[in-house]
Amino acid sequence: MGSMSVWHWVIVAVVVMLLFGRGKVSELMGDVAKGIKAFKKGMADDETQPNTATSVPPVGPNDPVRTLPHQGAPGTAPQPPHVQPHVSAGDHKAV
């Protein structure tokens, strides 16, 4: 009772054919086939075009070590160093 037999699938197929008609089912299957072909073509195109932006050049044992400058968290601007203002004795104003 848990699995469907061949006769169940035959009845389902006949009901689908009666509801949608032979033309609609064949049109739907053609659209599915076109979608699969387009997907496979897209996958083949991705495999033939290596992503050069993320590729890392090989490093030999005698190559110098390159370091990247430290950057803050994304979206934050670097803060300028805090400098104490210099106030001379003659610059005081009464508030």
UniProtKB/Swiss-Prot annotation:
The protein's role, per its UniProt record: Part of the twin-arginine translocation (Tat) system that transports large folded proteins containing a characteristic twin-arginine motif in their signal peptide across membranes. TatA could form the protein-conducting channel of the Tat system.
Family designation: Belongs to the TatA/E family.
Transmembrane regions listed in the UniProt entry: 1-21
InterPro entries linked: TatA/B/E (IPR003369), TatA/E (IPR006312)
GO cellular component, one term: TAT protein transport complex
Region annotation Disordered: where it falls in the sequence: 42-95
Gene3D superfamilies: 1.20.5.3310
Protein name (Swiss-Prot/TrEMBL): Sec-independent protein translocase protein TatA
Keywords on record: Cell inner membrane, Cell membrane, Membrane, Protein transport, Translocation, Transmembrane, Transmembrane helix, Transport
Source domain of life: Bacteria
Record text on subunit structure and interactions: The Tat system comprises two distinct complexes: a TatABC complex, containing multiple copies of TatA, TatB and TatC subunits, and a separate TatA complex, containing only TatA subunits. Substrates initially bind to the TatABC complex, which probably triggers association of the separate TatA complex to form the active translocon.
Membrane topology qualifier: Single-pass membrane protein
A Pfam family hit: TatA_B_E
Biological process (GO), any one: protein transport by the Tat complex
Localization annotation: Cell inner membrane
One Gene Ontology MF term: protein transmembrane transporter activity
Tagged with keyword Coiled coil: no
